[in-house]
Amino acid sequence: VVLKKELLWIHSRTQLLIRYTLLDARSDTQLRLRPFLAFRDRHGLSKANLFADGRSYPIPGGVRNRLYEGFPWLHMQMNVPCEFVAAPDWYYNFEYAEEIDRGYPGHEDLLTTGYFETDIVKGQSVIFSCSTEEVDPATLEKDFMEELARRSNKIDFLSCLRHSARQFIVRHGDKTEVVAGYPWFGR
């Protein structure tokens, strides 16, 4: 099996789209996606505990989860018919070598609430969405293509420079800022 994976953060939204395309397969193929969840701030690490809510709640095209009160819901949806198999379980000791090299703690436990399963055929693309808002699964392919089109071509030095500079401009209402240290300051 040869599978292509493309990730896109959607501009001005808290949404990640992941497109999987089956480029080659010699037999019937099933795609199984098992999201690992942390629900923590960017400086903390998650450890297995009895307080995490491992339940998943059905929404169109997927499920929503919130491991702890006070966090937003995480909506995970697919643009194709799929089955979500609830199977909550902790996975232990994920290692972040870069963090350890920097002198920070670098081991984390992550909870999975289950997995998505769908059939996929050669040449087919499937889009998986993670967002703090529920979306219409029927629009995921359009959203992916629009985000691709919105991005500038980075074919020469000047267009690369413009693209890089835009990543450090943050707008909050009518206020515009240039951020130093992005994204570590939460802007």
Regions found by a protein language model. Name each.
Residues 1-187:
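Acidic, mature catalytic/reactive cores of soluble proteins
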